[in-house]
């Protein structure tokens, strides 16, 4: 359950070799979706709304729209503005929301503490500082957000809408990419044979793509960048050939005047066709969402030096070819492959299919990542997360989501069988995410960057107007495919809101029904409580007080372990928590009670490894707390009040371990080994873990620096660990109180309970052994 030891922080100063290497690697991860858009943009634009004429006003107008859309949205908005709004190197919708949570104290997580604000990444980010002076409007806006819970919920729902549309894009992008790539076979065979080849081939490729997700991409990931690089070189070379061979004057269409002529001639039909032009910027959001895997400079270099010019040349080449071929539409749909020289069509078809698979892989991986972030922030049910690589940070696989995406992707592919309707659906999902980013960015500009409100207004009006124009053109196609992302987003949003609402109600019930520390301290006198050998971990969502499940447990079984730990594993609104800040440890009651509280903090992008090192880290953190408590004479007060212990920040085993030392069992069995050898470094420990899993023993070092009383407490801690660790968890069944409204009964009794029963519980998330786990059932009337 420890964060993976990958390097997730972007270096402040990188060598040019590192930057160029990252720029090259980003081609396969970030730009796969954006690079394959030439496959279907013209085909979707000229589907029905407008027609290609001999005056070339339509094709030149479309090219002008494509050029300025790519220039203004991916280049100006994302490369030069949005990429700067990173959350300690991380990007995406939740990165913006996390920034707002910290700078405006707008937090959807119920178990937040003041101690969380002392985290290094909480206090520092690369875009601004909370110590900078705020304008009067910014201070007023911040105060309004902090005071009004309704506005906070609206902000959360806005972020969730963007997230749901990203998930919808994870369904639609593989479908339209693979289907458009395979459609190239129509130029090489008769229509009778083509209709029996195109759809089955696309479905087989999609099934294979999703079936291979379980194995991870690290084995073939090194091929992604070369495939996209080859594809970009291919389409740019074909574009240059078509420009010089068919129409060298096509560059004139880059003038905005052709957009005016296009709309003047086509009027409402031209406006409706913008839904197809919109597809030229699909995948732009990936530049920001995948920022955590690369760096700002590397992503900017890759886009400005290679991706942007290649795409412009490709679109200009297609327009140049179509400007000299006005009867193609009567024979074939206007698509990418008609502009490819006939001798190159089969090789280009193969490269296009490979590029489509790479682009689809990127959006699928991104969907897994954003669902994990939602789950960490309490906005998505707990799901099984499989780490497919021990070396590459963030390579995860979620089985349930993978198969849901595959079924939905096959359904829309088989149901539509048409690039136009697939494009309408994909376009609406893409532009909705961009609108959400624009809205959140306007708040970030004021609250986090501390810029003038005029700058925020200019940003949201300029880019919001462009995106609203495309959004309206996509929304008008509701019955022609655009209903799909809306339906998908509604279903996922309903599940997310239901889970978040149920989680909040459960936490509120725990807070209202927690028992006082006085009750816990008086147990041995009133009920004759027995203390048994071993270490007991009471899993709770509370950061203070004693949970109701423990009182319920002790009332029915009056005994608990000689060392008792109230364990809270929670997420905080930062991307990563450093190992030295992972644990908050405190004491409950007098020393002789041996009762502790441990709060384990993870960021929303931290990777939890499913292994048994968590127990060792927990024992180490408690031992370090005991040692430092004695050394600093800051002994925890023998609290008899409601609010118990003072918490101390303690790191993992790799950062501190002077209180106790760990030994492998093979070392202890050797009589020649001294009893107080130095602690192993993290790397050797990791190498030996596979051979001696769960065979680590802790020993108190023989040193005069440790006082007798402290040594005794440390020895009892190690003896309790050797006696066995028991996990005591609550299994709550939630029911709405009698007299609750219909919506609340539907949300709690049906929606939340259905999600809870069909997703992973706390025992699965902690990877606790079945034989050592005790679940305490309770009914929560909320």
From Swiss-Prot:
The keyword Transmembrane helix applies. Keywords: Cell membrane, Ion transport, Membrane, Potassium, Potassium transport, Transmembrane, Transmembrane helix, Transport. Residues 664-675 have a biased composition (Basic and acidic residues). Pfam families: K_trans, K_trans_C. Residues 40-61, 175-195, 241-270, 318-347, 417-421, 464-474 are extracellular. Belongs to the HAK/KUP transporter (TC 2.A.72.3) family. Residues 664-693 are annotated as: Disordered. The chain crosses the membrane at residues 19-39, 62-82, 154-174, 196-216, 220-240, 271-291, 297-317, 348-368, 396-416, 422-442, 443-463, 475-495. It is a multi-pass membrane protein. The keyword Nucleus does not apply. Signal peptide: none annotated. This is Potassium transporter 6. GO terms for cellular component: plasma membrane. It comes from Arabidopsis thaliana. GO terms for molecular function: potassium ion transmembrane transporter activity. Residues 1-18, 83-153, 217-219, 292-296, 369-395, 496-782 are cytoplasmic. It is found in: Cell membrane. Residues 682-693 have a biased composition (Basic residues). InterPro entries: K+_transporter, K_trans_C, K_trans_N. Probable potassium transporter.
């Amino acid at each position: 359950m420890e964060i993976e030891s990958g390097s997730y922080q972007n270096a402040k100063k990188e060598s040019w070799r590192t930057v160029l290497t990252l720029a090259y690697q980003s081609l396969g991860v970030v730009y796969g979706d954006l690079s394959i858009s030439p496959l279907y943009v013209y085909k979707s634009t000229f589907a029905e709304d407008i027609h290609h004429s001999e005056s070339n006003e339509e094709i030149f107008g479309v090219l002008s729209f494509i050029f300025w859309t790519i220039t203004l949205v991916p280049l100006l908005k994302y490369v030069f503005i949005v990429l700067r709004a990173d959350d300690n190197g991380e990007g995406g919708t939740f990165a913006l929301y996390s920034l707002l949570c910290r700078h405006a104290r707008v937090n959807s997580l119920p178990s937040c503490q003041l101690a969380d604000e002392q985290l290094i990444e909480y206090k520092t980010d690369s875009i601004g500082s909370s110590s900078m002076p705020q304008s009067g409007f910014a201070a007023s806006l911040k105060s309004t957000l902090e005071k009004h819970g309704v506005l906070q919920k609206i902000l959360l729902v806005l972020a969730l809408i963007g997230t749901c549309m990203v998930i919808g894009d994870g369904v639609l992008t593989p479908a339209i990419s693979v289907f458009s790539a395979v459609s190239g076979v129509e130029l090489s065979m008769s229509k009778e044979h083509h209709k029996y080849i195109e759809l089955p081939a696309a479905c087989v490729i999609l099934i294979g793509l999703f079936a291979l997700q379980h194995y991870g991409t690290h084995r073939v990931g090194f091929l992604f960048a070369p495939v996209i690089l080859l594809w970009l070189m291919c389409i740019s070379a074909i574009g240059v050939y078509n420009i010089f061979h068919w129409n060298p004057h096509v560059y004139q269409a880059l003038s905005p005047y052709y957009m005016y002529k296009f709309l003047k001639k086509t009027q409402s039909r031209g406006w409706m066709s913008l839904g197809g032009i919109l597809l030229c910027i699909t995948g732009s959001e990936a530049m920001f969402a995948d920022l955590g895997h690369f760096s700002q400079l590397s992503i900017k270099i890759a886009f400005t030096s290679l991706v942007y010019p290649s795409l412009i040349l490709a679109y200009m080449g297609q327009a140049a070819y179509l400007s000299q071929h006005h009867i193609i539409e009567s024979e074939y749909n206007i698509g990418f492959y008609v502009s490819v020289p006939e001798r190159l069509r089969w090789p280009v078809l193969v490269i296009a299919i490979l590029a489509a698979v790479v682009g689809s892989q990127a959006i699928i991986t991104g969907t897994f990542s954003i669902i994990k972030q939602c789950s960490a922030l309490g906005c998505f049910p707990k799901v099984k997360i499989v780490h497919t690589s021990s070396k590459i940070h963030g390579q995860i696989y979620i089985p349930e989501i993978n198969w849901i995406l595959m079924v939905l992707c096959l359904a829309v592919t088989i149901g539509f069988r048409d690039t136009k309707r697939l494009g309408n659906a994909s376009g609406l999902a893409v532009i909705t995410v961009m609108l959400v980013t624009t809205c959140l960015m306007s708040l970030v500009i004021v609250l986090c960057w501390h810029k003038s409100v005029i700058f925020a207004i200019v940003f949201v009006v300029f880019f919001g107007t462009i995106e609203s124009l495309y959004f309206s053109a996509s929304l008008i196609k509701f019955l022609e495919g655009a209903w799909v992302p809306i339906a998908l987003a509604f279903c996922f949003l309903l599940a997310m809101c239901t889970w978040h609402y149920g989680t909040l109600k459960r936490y509120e019930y725990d807070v209202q029904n927690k028992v006082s520390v006085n009750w816990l301290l008086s147990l041995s006198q009133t009920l004759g409580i027995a203390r048994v050998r071993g270490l007991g971990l009471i899993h709770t969502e509370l950061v203070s007080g004693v949970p109701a499940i423990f009182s319920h447990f002790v009332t029915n079984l009056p005994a608990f372990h000689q060392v008792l730990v109230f364990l809270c594993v929670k997420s905080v609104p930062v991307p990563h928590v450093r190992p030295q800040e992972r644990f908050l440890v405190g004491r409950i009651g007098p020393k002789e009670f041996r009762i502790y509280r441990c709060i384990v903090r993870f960021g929303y992008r931290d990777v939890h490894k499913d292994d048994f090192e968590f127990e060792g880290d927990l024992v180490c953190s408690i031992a370090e707390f005991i040692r430092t408590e004695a050394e600093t004479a800051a002994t925890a007060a023998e609290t008899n009040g409601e609010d118990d212990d003072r918490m101390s920040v303690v790191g993992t085993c790799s950062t501190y371990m002077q209180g106790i030392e760990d030994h492998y069992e093979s070392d202890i069995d050797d009589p020649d080994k001294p009893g107080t050898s130095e602690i192993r470094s993290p790397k050797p420990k990791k190498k030996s873990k596979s051979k001696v899993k769960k065979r680590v023993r802790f020993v108190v070092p023989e040193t005069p620096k440790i006082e007798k009383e402290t040594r005794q407490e440390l020895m009892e801690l190690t003896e309790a660990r050797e006696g066995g660790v028991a996990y005591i968890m609550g299994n709550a069944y939630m029911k709405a109180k009698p007299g609750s409204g219909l919506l609340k009964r539907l949300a709690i009794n049906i929606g939340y309970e259905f999600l809870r029963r069909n997703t992973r519980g706390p025992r699965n998330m902690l990877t606790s052994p079945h034989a050592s786990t005790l679940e305490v059932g309770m009914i929560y009337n909320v």
